[in-house]
């Protein structure tokens, strides 16, 4: 084997090694392969590869001398395959012609003649080294118009000027000047002076560009002058137009940079000449240099004009005077130095004119007249320079700066502005919403672009601003503090409601079908369009999640940035199930968070700032997993199975918070979030295997609770951890008590059922003795408000645990009923009954009204900083103490107490009466009275929906307890009526997610005879007596209203079945809600409630079966079954009559006009339904209720009615149906006549007299049965000319006769009589002509009876057969007016109209 060369071996040794290698014939270790060109094409691709050619070094052929140090020829690009060389061209000739090597250039060099060039010797000086050049030295001798020339160029120009001046005094110049007769390029000869083109202003006194420099002295002047004369002769032979044309052609051919250089060169020479001539005028030797004007005088004159406009001294009062010798200050631009002046005084605002908002660097809103010092850095802006602070437009402009620090500063200020705006600091000082303004300006995508920045500081500030925008302060604190409330883990999604509401048929479509149908449309929409309606969806469409994962996984940011990212992810997960799924499925995002921020082992972390959160457990990361798990049972199962959360939960829960080697607060929050995550998983029946492993830990934690409760003062974080522990035990107890789900036919419902829980009853049966002492200890603090508020969540969680414990105990088939009944009796006697008798509990009931949202609807006004595209709870400023979520709120404790009492009363019937005594509390009675009273309903906002849901829980549990008590013993009449009114009000207010409560109210309280005490206290008899005493009894017989009410009470079960059929929620929603409220954990699909866009039932729900019946009849041309139609209509009318008579407050939210429209639907459903005697009696009774004197003034048909697009359209349809099928039915006719009153729209009367004249013959309702007074139709007089003409036409043609339609006949006669005898001087000519013509025709009528009625009408009187009184003789004024008109008619004839 050949050895490698070693250091020290000579070239002879290397050649010897080479000969040995060649003689051996071994294969080389490296093979040279010629690569193709970079264009991808290989010109020599057909050649075979070189196999045997090797590079051999031969020292014999090397030259003796080293090569010349000349630059090698530049690399030449190989011709591309698409460019073919000409075949007839010699390659050598082509290379020779394009050869640019130094050897080819040297052969073409012509030596420059320097014999005529003056040589100046250096100036002798007395120092050893030349003087050092300083930039600040005086350069007044330089040209003032040097522009942007370098210092070297300025020095050269100054030297040329000095040379042009000649030697100064005392300067030694050797006699080596040019020979006599030599001229320079600036000195014109006499023969070329005064050369000027004819017709041109340009004179040529000598050559300018061609100087002859470099030629021999004899030939220089001659050649330059010859070229100049040839140019002059050529220019003189051309016309001015040809010169300009040739000039434009040359300019187009030349390089623009070259043209600019020539022009600047000419202008520089001109300025140099001027300066030199001016400086040499006083005396001394000078060269006779004449100024030349260049050809393009317009370009050269511009600098001179600008120089003339510039003053010698600054006109502005600047702090310092700029010197031209300063760097880059040779040309002073005064307009750019305004910023150096002193600021003008702050303008005081004298009017209410709006001014631009300006903010400090901390995001504070500055007053318009505030005067702050300039060293604060708040005056670096152009507009309104005297005002401190920066506007939003200026901050937006700064975010696009090229300096990263400026971008970070702008984002930081904007984040501070958003935080302060959401905190409500600006109040009403700003016109409009800051968040809406920023979102409309594109701030969202500005943040998204900033996240892609390369500077870590900008990324961190952008993430901080994104958190300030998305995460409203206070929202997470509110949801965390209420996690242990009654169903506190359930939340509404924080997403905007859909603007376009679907039809009822589309609402009944399954949610999966809707999502599939809408997803392609949403995917095709661009992110800005999505963000306009939903900020979160717009952000997710911009690949935000992968970017946040990259920041966490690659850049390793600081703790603040990590917490901001986790907070943003929590807000995204709370948006909807879809957003939570996208967060879970983002590649490596959850893996990174679990790996880096939820490790199973970590180094101890002390108190104080943490340098890094990586490899340290983070409570916020645990909370993110908990929020994700709350979105659905499938997400929870994936989290538990795919990310090894079992070991992490065991690691954190197994140790007490003080033993976790973390800061105390962080350890408490981490332990609390771990318990909550486990509780959420247990809400789906998952995570039961952890209970067996951590059973000793949980028992030890429960045993320590009494000691922690005795701490003074109690620590809030510890109380939250204890409440979370009790909530976890509550869910585990429910899981142990739940039985395996039965077989379900529906596959969708079967998917909700899981395997039986791994927790058994024997494993949780020992928890109650440990929890009950904790409850007893906390109840002792009830009389101490401060301590009670501190331990607030603990007694709530204890009560909820006891309720779940007894519920699960009673469901165990192996347990003895006597055991749990005796234990309930013991708990009631020892704990609950003494609690109910405490005065402090009464104070909690009294504070319900002060903390209620229903009793204080103005307390939930939507916040100003609440853009519809970005939903938040709006708890930035914290909840007031006397509010539902405040520290003094009695709702969580009383709701948990009522839940426990309901559980005990349902299991132990003997305790029901004793426990129901709590309902007699005066505070609860007053609270119910105020909730039932009519008033403005709270505006439905995200916070009001959250708060009202908890308030409705308390109301429902109180009503459920009252229903259980009423089933055993009669309730007091006043209490029963109050509870029934409360149930009716609650039924129309329940929000989505409470479908089970709606169903239970329909089953129990609403249609129970126990809550209608009027049926046994003389209610029907009182109704009959009221009919007899009613002033309107002479008009509409009420058909025995008392009898109808008594019959309705007997038919109450049928009425309940009817409403259960038509008002029950969808089956899937009902089952999901039922599983949540019953504790059937295996069927719970999600802890995320449906969107609270509106209540489950409309305000007019008593008419809902009738409305659906009307829609079914409209969609079914063949008609509906008479049996179903008759039964549904009767039950609805009976129930509405009960409400109108005994619970009128339940229908106060339904306007009388809407009730009238619903009654019309009875006649529109079928052509025979209204003929049935029961329906006739019920409709007549309800019509009489609408026509009562206290209700009739509120009947307004001109306003917009709920559920109705247009009442005139409904009335036109009603007239069509009346004309077709009524056959003169009096009740039908009464409903037709009711909207024709004078105070209603004239459109309704025009519809009858203009389009349905044939219906007049069927309106045979007698005057005595008219439901309202006749004066409602005749007063005030009609002023619509078209309707008056229709009245007169129907009277004259006989279409309207007193025996066919007595009511409208009297109405038409009254209005026509009032019109023809009206003498209003302000009437138009058209009205006067119509009045005169109508009176003339009336006087000439052949029908004497009609003529007598129209002329002698006096007053309406429904007791007379005609319906009005007549004058026996016309009044004198009318008689005189009629005689004057008739005399004119006899003379001129009757005018035609």
UniProtKB/Swiss-Prot annotation:
Q: What is the lineage of its organism?
A: Eukaryota, Metazoa, Chordata, Craniata, Vertebrata
Name the UniProt key words of this record, in alphabetical order: DNA-binding, DNA-directed RNA polymerase, Nucleotidyltransferase, Nucleus, Phosphoprotein, Transcription, Transferase
The GO terms this record gives for MF are: DNA binding; nucleotidyltransferase activity
Subcellular compartments? Nucleus
Phosphothreonine is found on 321
By what name is this protein known? RNA polymerase II-associated protein 1
Report biased composition (Pro residues) as residue ranges: 64-74
Alphabetical GO biological process terms:
transcription by RNA polymerase II
- Extract the coiled-coil ranges from the record: none
Q: Which gene encodes it?
A: RPAP1
């Amino acid at each position: 084997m050949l050895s490698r060369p070693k250091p020290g071996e000579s070239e002879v040794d290397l050649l010897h090694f080479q000969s040995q290698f060649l003689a051996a014939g071994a294969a080389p270790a490296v093979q040279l392969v010629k690569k193709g060109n970079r264009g991808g094409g290989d010109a020599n691709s057909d050649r075979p590869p070189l196999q045997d050619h090797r590079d051999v070094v031969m020292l014999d052929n090397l030259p003796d001398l080293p090569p010349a140090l000349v630059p090698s020829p530049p690399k030449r690009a190989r011709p591309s395959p698409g460019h073919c060389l000409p075949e007839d061209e010699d390659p050598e000739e082509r290379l020779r012609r394009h050869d640019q090597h130094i050897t080819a250039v040297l052969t073409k060099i012509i030596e420059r003649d320097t014999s005529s060039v003056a040589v100046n010797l250096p100036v002798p000086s007395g120092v050893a080294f030349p003087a050092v050049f300083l930039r600040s030295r005086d350069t007044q001798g330089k040209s003032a118009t040097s522009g942007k020339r370098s210092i070297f160029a300025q020095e050269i120009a100054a030297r040329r000027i000095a040379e042009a001046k000649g030697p100064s005094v005392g300067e030694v110049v050797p006699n080596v000047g040019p020979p006599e007769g030599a001229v320079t390029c600036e000195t014109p000869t006499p023969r070329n002076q005064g050369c000027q083109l004819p017709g041109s202003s340009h004179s040529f006194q000598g050559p300018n560009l061609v100087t002859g420099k470099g030629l021999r002295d004899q030939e220089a002047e001659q050649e330059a002058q010859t070229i100049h004369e040839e140019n002059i002769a050529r220019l003189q032979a051309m016309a001015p137009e040809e010169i300009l044309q040739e000039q434009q052609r040359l300019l187009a051919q030349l390089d623009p940079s070259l043209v600019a250089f020539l022009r600047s060169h000419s202008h520089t020479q001109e300025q140099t000449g001027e300066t030199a001539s001016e400086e040499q005028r006083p005396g001394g030797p000078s060269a006779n240099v004449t100024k030349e004007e260049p050809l393009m005088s317009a370009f050269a004159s511009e600098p001179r004009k600008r120089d003339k406009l510039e003053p010698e001294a600054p006109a502005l009062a600047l702090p310092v005077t700029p010197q031209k010798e300063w760097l880059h200050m040779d040309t002073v631009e005064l307009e750019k130095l305004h910023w150096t002046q002193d600021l003008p005084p702050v303008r005081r605002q004298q009017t209410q004119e709006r001014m631009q908002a300006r903010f400090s660097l901390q995001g504070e809103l500055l007053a318009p007249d505030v005067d702050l010092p300039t060293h604060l850095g708040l005056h670096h802006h152009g507009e309104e320079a005297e005002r401190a602070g920066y506007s939003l437009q200026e901050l937006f402009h700064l975010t696009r700066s090229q300096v990263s620090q400026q971008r970070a500063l702008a984002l930081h200020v904007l984040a501070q502005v958003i935080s302060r705006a959401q905190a409500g600091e600006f109040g009403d000082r700003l016109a409009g919403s800051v968040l809406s303004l920023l979102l409309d300006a594109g701030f969202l995508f500005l943040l998204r672009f900033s996240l892609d920045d390369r500077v870590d500081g900008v990324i961190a500030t952008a993430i901080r601003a994104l958190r300030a925008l998305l995460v409203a302060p206070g929202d997470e604190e509110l949801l965390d503090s209420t996690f242990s409330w009654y169903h506190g883990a359930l939340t509404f999604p924080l997403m905007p409601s859909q603007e376009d509401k679907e039809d009822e048929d589309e609402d009944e479509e399954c949610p999966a079908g809707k999502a599939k149908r809408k997803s392609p449309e949403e995917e095709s929409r661009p992110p800005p369009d999505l963000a306009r309606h939903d900020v979160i969806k717009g952000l997710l469409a911009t690949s935000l999640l992968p970017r946040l994962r990259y920041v966490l996984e690659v850049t390793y940011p600081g703790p603040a940035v990590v917490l901001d990212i986790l907070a943003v992810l929590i807000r995204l997960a709370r948006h909807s199930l879809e957003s939570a799924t996208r967060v879970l499925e983002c590649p490596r995002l959850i893996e990174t968070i679990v790996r880096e921020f939820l490790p199973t082992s970590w180094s101890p972390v002390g108190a104080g700032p943490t340098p890094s959160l990586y490899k340290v457990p983070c409570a916020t990361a645990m909370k993110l997993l908990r929020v994700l798990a709350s979105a659905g049972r499938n997400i929870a199962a994936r989290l538990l199975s795919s990310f090894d959360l079992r070991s992490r939960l065991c690691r954190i829960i197994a140790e007490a918070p003080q033993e976790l080697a973390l800061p105390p607060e962080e350890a408490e929050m981490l332990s609390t979030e771990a318990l909550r995550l486990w509780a959420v998983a247990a809400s789906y029946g998952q995570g039961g295997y952890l209970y067996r492993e951590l059973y000793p830990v949980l028992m030890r934690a429960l045993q320590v609770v009494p000691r922690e409760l005795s701490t003074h003062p109690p620590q809030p974080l510890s109380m939250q951890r204890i409440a979370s522990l009790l909530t976890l035990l509550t869910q585990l107890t429910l899981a142990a008590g739940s039985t395996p789900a039965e077989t379900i036919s529906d596959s969708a419902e079967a998917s909700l059922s899981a395997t039986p829980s791994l927790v058994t009853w024997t494993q949780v049966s020992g928890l109650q003795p440990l929890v009950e002492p904790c409850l007893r200890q906390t109840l002792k603090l009830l009389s101490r408000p401060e301590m009670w508020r501190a331990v607030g969540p603990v007694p709530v969680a204890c009560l909820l645990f006891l309720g779940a414990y007894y519920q699960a105990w009673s469901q165990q088939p192996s347990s003895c009923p006597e055991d749990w009944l005796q234990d309930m009796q013991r708990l009631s006697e020892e704990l609950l009954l003494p609690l109910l008798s405490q005065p402090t509990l009464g104070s909690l009931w009294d504070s319900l009204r002060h903390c209620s949202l229903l009793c204080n609807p103005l307390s939930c006004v939507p916040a100003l900083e609440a853009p519809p595209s970005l939903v938040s709870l709006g708890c930035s400023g914290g909840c007031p103490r006397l509010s539902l979520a405040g520290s003094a709120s009695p709702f969580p404790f009383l709701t948990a107490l009522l839940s426990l009492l309901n559980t005990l009363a349902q299991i132990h019937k003997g305790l029901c009466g004793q426990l129901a005594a709590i309902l007699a509390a005066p505070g609860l009675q007053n609270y119910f009275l105020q909730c039932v009273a009519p008033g403005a309903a709270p505006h439905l906002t995200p916070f009001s929906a959250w708060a009202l849901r908890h308030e409705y829980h308390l109301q429902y549990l109180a009503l459920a307890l009252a229903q259980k008590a009423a089933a055993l013993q009669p309730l007091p009449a006043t209490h029963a009526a109050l509870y029934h009114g409360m149930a009716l009000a609650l039924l129309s207010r329940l929000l989505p997610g409470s479908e089970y409560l709606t169903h239970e109210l329909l089953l129990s309280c609403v249609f129970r005879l126990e809550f209608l005490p009027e049926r046994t206290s003389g209610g029907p008899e009182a109704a009959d007596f009221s009919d007899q005493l009613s002033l309107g009894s002479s008009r509409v017989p009420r058909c025995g209203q008392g009898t109808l009410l008594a019959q309705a009470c007997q038919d109450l079960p049928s009425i309940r079945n009817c409403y259960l059929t038509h008002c029950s929620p969808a089956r899937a929603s009902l089952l999901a809600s039922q599983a949540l409220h019953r504790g059937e954990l295996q069927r719970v699909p999600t802890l995320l409630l449906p969107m609270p866009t509106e209540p489950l039932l409309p305000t007019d729900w008593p008419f809902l079966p009738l409305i659906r019946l009307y829609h079914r009849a409209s969609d079914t041309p063949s008609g509906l079954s008479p049996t179903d139609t008759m039964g549904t209509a009767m039950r609805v009318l009976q129930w509405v009559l009960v409400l109108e008579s005994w619970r009128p407050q339940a229908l106060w939210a339904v306007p009388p006009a809407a009730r009238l429209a619903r009654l019309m639907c009875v006649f529109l459903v079928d052509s025979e339904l209204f003929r049935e005697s029961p329906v006739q009696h019920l409709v007549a009774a309800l019509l009489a209720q609408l026509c009562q004197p206290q209700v009739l003034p509120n009947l307004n048909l001109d306003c917009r009615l709920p559920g109705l697009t247009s009442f005139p359209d409904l009335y036109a349809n009603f007239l069509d149906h009346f004309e077709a099928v009524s056959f003169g039915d009096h009740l039908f006719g009464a409903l037709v006549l009711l909207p024709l009153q004078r105070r209603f729209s004239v459109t309704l009367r025009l519809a009858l007299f203009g389009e349905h004249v044939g219906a007049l013959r069927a309106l045979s309702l007698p005057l005595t049965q008219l439901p309202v007074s006749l004066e409602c139709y005749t007063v005030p007089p009609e002023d619509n000319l078209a309707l008056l003409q229709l009245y007169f036409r129907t009277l004259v043609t006989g279409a309207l006769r007193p025996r066919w339609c007595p009511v409208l006949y009297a109405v038409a006669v009254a209005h026509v009589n009032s019109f023809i005898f009206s003498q209003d001087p302000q009437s138009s000519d058209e009205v006067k002509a119509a009045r005169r013509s109508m009176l003339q025709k009336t006087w000439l009528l052949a029908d004497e009876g009609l003529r007598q009625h129209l002329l002698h009408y006096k007053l309406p009187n429904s007791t007379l057969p005609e319906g009005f009184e007549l004058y026996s003789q016309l009044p004198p004024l009318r008689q005189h007016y009629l005689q004057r008109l008739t005399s004119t008619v006899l003379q001129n004839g009757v005018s035609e109209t």
